[in-house]
Amino acid sequence: MGLLTCMFSSNSKESSSVRIKDSSISHPHTGQHISIRTFRELKAQQMSNPTWKKTETCLIMEFSRSMEDRLEEVANLPTTHMPRQSIQGPKLRPSIY
């Protein structure tokens, strides 16, 4: 049996003790595909505030992307060109009074 790999992510309520824990355990075998078992644990209590506080989610996905993929994503972002501002000071209009 190969290396044991564990991944963890969780979400929790800010004002309560509601917690969701996701974890995956993989057991890679030499010369075989990785087998993954995923578990979800939900402990819910009375909710008073529906505000979510995210912690540790998407961390594994970000690290699995290659630098080439990230550079391509940045290159494809839309750009906004700002108009050039005049170096001169504001133009004064003559007063009619």
From Swiss-Prot:
Keywords for the protein's UniProt record, in alphabetical order: Host cell membrane, Host membrane, Host-virus interaction, Inhibition of host innate immune response by virus, Lipoprotein, Membrane, Myristate, Suppressor of RNA silencing, Viral immunoevasion
Region Disordered: start-end pairs: 1-31, 75-97
GO CC terms of this entry: host cell plasma membrane; membrane
Any Pfam family: Gemini_C4
GO BP annotations, alphabetical order: symbiont-mediated suppression of host innate immune response
InterPro entries hit by this protein: Gemini_C4
Major localization listed first in the record, in broad terms: host cell
Family: Belongs to the geminiviridae protein AC4/C4 family.
Signal sequence region: none
Organism name: Tomato yellow leaf curl China virus
Identification of the protein by name: Protein C4
Lineage of the species this protein comes from: Viruses, Monodnaviria, Shotokuvirae, Cressdnaviricota, Repensiviricetes
Physiological role: Pathogenicity determinant. May act as a suppressor of RNA-mediated gene silencing, also known as post-transcriptional gene silencing (PTGS), a mechanism of plant viral defense that limits the accumulation of viral RNAs.
Polar residues composition-biased segments: 77-88
Residue positions bearing lipid (N-myristoyl glycine): 2
Membrane topology: Lipid-anchor
Record's subcellular location: Host cell membrane
